[in-house]
């Protein structure tokens, strides 16, 4: 295996383990991974306690797990679409240059 491949593998391992080591044992109790929606809502209520939202969601997921599932599904669909267009453009480029 070439030296640059070994460096790349070590880089991936370090980038994977660094967040796990930095935040081990810390979680939502200390405010990590809290989410932007909750923080924004708290800040709005702090600035203007009489604020009333313009609208309410027509459906809220019954649990956090389903909310996470829908978020992951949305990310997967987006990745598939982006991957399709990268592959399509690569094939078009290869066909043009043959």
Curated annotation (Swiss-Prot):
Identify the Pfam families for this entry: CbiN
Record-level Gene Ontology MF annotations: cobalt ion transmembrane transporter activity
Query: Which keywords does UniProt give here?
Result: Cell membrane, Cobalamin biosynthesis, Cobalt, Cobalt transport, Ion transport, Membrane, Transmembrane, Transmembrane helix, Transport
Q: Which GO terms describe its biological process?
A: cobalamin biosynthetic process
Instruction: Tell me where it resides.
Output: Cell membrane
Domain of life, per lineage: Archaea
Q: How does it sit in the membrane?
A: Multi-pass membrane protein
Transmembrane region(s) = 6-26, 68-88
Q: In which pathway is this protein known to take part?
A: Cofactor biosynthesis; adenosylcobalamin biosynthesis
User: Under the cellular component aspect of Gene Ontology, which terms does the record hold?
Assistant: plasma membrane
Keyword Hydrolase in record: no
In terms of HAMAP family, this protein maps to:
CbiN
Q: Which family does it belong to?
A: Belongs to the CbiN family.
> Subunit structure, per the record?
Forms an energy-coupling factor (ECF) transporter complex composed of an ATP-binding protein (A component, CbiO), a transmembrane protein (T component, CbiQ) and 2 possible substrate-capture proteins (S components, CbiM and CbiN) of unknown stoichimetry.
Relate the protein's function as given in its record: Part of the energy-coupling factor (ECF) transporter complex CbiMNOQ involved in cobalt import.
* Protein's UniProt name: Cobalt transport protein CbiN
Question: What organism is this sequence from?
Answer: Methanococcus maripaludis (strain DSM 14266 / JCM 13030 / NBRC 101832 / S2 / LL)
